[in-house]
């Protein structure tokens, strides 16, 4: 097995007609609409979970936390991320770095990015220097540009620990 493994994750959630905040990177961000989701709808943490699971060839977030399971209804995605990290550690993987890109026309993410990085680093038991989060728009194109939802991509590097 290779010592280094790379995974990519993607998630998207549509805005709902109700709510007054969204959760991204474990941070509550005021917004005129919430996100439609079975859990808390944290697209960043969901994409990161998928990237980590993919790098380890463990499947995807839906396999481990299915939206058909009522126990995950309204779930805090930070708990999901911590569970994924625990699975990785049990199999001898160490997180090298994580890079996430939030795609949203609104709300502005820049004021919240440092708090997101702190949360992710804490939940992954890594230095904040191993976590990068950035945000972009689609210049008003597509569903994110029309403010219909938020998407996120994430890439993760894992290192398999030698036995």
From Swiss-Prot:
The keyword DNA damage does not apply. Its EC number is 4.6.1.12. GO terms for biological process: isopentenyl diphosphate biosynthetic process, methylerythritol 4-phosphate pathway; terpenoid biosynthetic process. Its cofactor is a divalent metal cation. Keywords: Isoprene biosynthesis, Lyase, Metal-binding. InterPro entries: MECDP_synthase, MECDP_synthase_CS, MECDP_synthase_sf. The keyword Lyase applies. It comes from the Bacteria. Binds 1 divalent metal cation per subunit. 4-CDP-2-C-methyl-D-erythritol 2-phosphate binds at residues 11-13, 38-39, 60-62, 65-69, 104-110, 136-139, 146. It is an enzyme of class 4 (lyase). The record marks 38, 137 as: Transition state stabilizer. SUPFAM superfamilies: IpsF-like. Pathway: Isoprenoid biosynthesis; isopentenyl diphosphate biosynthesis via DXP pathway; isopentenyl diphosphate from 1-deoxy-D-xylulose 5-phosphate: step 4/6. It catalyses: 4-CDP-2-C-methyl-D-erythritol 2-phosphate = 2-C-methyl-D-erythritol 2,4-cyclic diphosphate + CMP. A divalent metal cation binds at residues 11, 13, 46. One of its GO terms (molecular function) is metal ion binding. Involved in the biosynthesis of isopentenyl diphosphate (IPP) and dimethylallyl diphosphate (DMAPP), two major building blocks of isoprenoid compounds. Catalyzes the conversion of 4-diphosphocytidyl-2-C-methyl-D-erythritol 2-phosphate (CDP-ME2P) to 2-C-methyl-D-erythritol 2,4-cyclodiphosphate (ME-CPP) with a corresponding release of cytidine 5-monophosphate (CMP). Homotrimer. Belongs to the IspF family. This is 2-C-methyl-D-erythritol 2,4-cyclodiphosphate synthase. It comes from Hahella chejuensis (strain KCTC 2396).
């Amino acid at each position: 097995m290779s010592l280094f493994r790379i995974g990519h994750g993607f998630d998207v959630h549509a805005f709902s007609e109700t709510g007054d905040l969204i959760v991204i990177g474990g941070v509550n961000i005021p917004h005129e609409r919430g996100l439609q989701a079975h859990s808390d709808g944290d697209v960043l943490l969901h994409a990161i979970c998928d990237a980590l699971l993919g790098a380890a060839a463990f499947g995807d977030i839906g396999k481990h936390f299915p939206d058909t399971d009522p126990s995950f209804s309204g779930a805090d995605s930070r708990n999901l991320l911590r569970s994924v990290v625990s699975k990785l550690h049990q199999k001898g993987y160490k997180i090298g770095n994580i890079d996430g890109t939030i795609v949203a026309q609104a709300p502005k993410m820049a004021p919240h990015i440092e708090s997101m990085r702190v949360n992710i680093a804490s939940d992954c038991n890594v230095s904040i220097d191993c976590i990068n989060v950035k945000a972009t728009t689609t210049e008003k194109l597509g569903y994110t540009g029309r403010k219909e939802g938020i998407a996120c991509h994430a890439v993760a590097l894992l290192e398999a620990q030698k036995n």
